[in-house]
UniProtKB/Swiss-Prot annotation:
Family recorded in the similarity comment: Belongs to the aTrm56 family.
Gene Ontology cellular component annotations, sorted alphabetically: cytoplasm
Subcellular location: Cytoplasm
Catalytic EC class: transferase
Quaternary context: Homodimer.
HAMAP family per UniProt: tRNA_methyltr_aTrm56
Source organism, top-level taxon: Archaea
Main location group: cytoplasm
CDD domains for this protein: aTrm56-like
Protein name, per record: tRNA (cytidine(56)-2'-O)-methyltransferase
Enzyme Commission numbers on file: 2.1.1.206
Length: 186
């Protein structure tokens, strides 16, 4: 089972920071792919790839795909579509059912006003809460609930840097220098 995140409605002049954060949360919280629908924004893709070069991971990334066709093809191949929206069913009421299907999941995260198509084609319209909030927060909460917190303990292949947990300060270990000693940044 794989989870991909489709970012719909990205506006390059306005949304690059938030869309980058959607991609970074997808990676950090255990998604397998990030799709930037309908546009190609090299800054967003470059930022996510730069993080992966340093911090590891094998997140599949694509951009410029037709969002509607991608969703329809996902469903045709037997996957389910989850649209995160504050208007949907509460996550507590559907997360166990979604997890229990054991199918590939495409999570749709909108930027601009989401057209009715996505509400209608989604197998689940899921609300993290029924109040306005960030799509980044919604994705993080959904993935955390889906994986039941296990994603917070992921380690990423090919990492050049890892965090060394510390009660104070910042400690970062360079993996390439592991044999020579620990490198820290304070």
């Amino acid at each position: 089972m794989k989870i991909y995140v489709l970012r719909y409605g990205h506006r390059p002049g306005r949304d690059k920071r938030i869309t980058t954060h959607v991609g970074l949360v997808a990676r950090a919280f255990g998604a397998h792919g990030f799709i930037l629908g309908d546009v190609i924004d090299e800054k967003v893709i470059g930022s996510i790839k730069k993080v992966m070069e340093r911090w590891g991971g094998n997140l599949y990334i694509d951009a410029g795909v037709d969002s509607r066709k991608y969703v329809l093809e996902w469903k045709r191949r037997g996957g389910i579509v989850v649209h995160l929206t504050m208007y949907g069913l509460h996550i507590d009421d559907v997360i166990d059912e979604i997890r229990g299907l054991n199918k590939d999941i495409l999570i749709v995260v909108g930027a601009e006003k989401v057209p009715p198509f996505f509400y209608e084609v989604a197998d689940y319209n899921v609300a993290i809460g029924h109040q306005p909030h960030s799509e980044v927060a919604a994705l993080a909460v959904f993935l955390d609930r889906f994986y039941m917190g296990k994603e917070l303990h992921l380690s990423f292949p090919n990492a050049k840097l890892i965090i060394v947990p510390s009660p104070r300060g910042k400690k970062v270990k360079k993996i390439a220098e592991e044999e020579e000693g620990e490198s820290t940044k304070d």
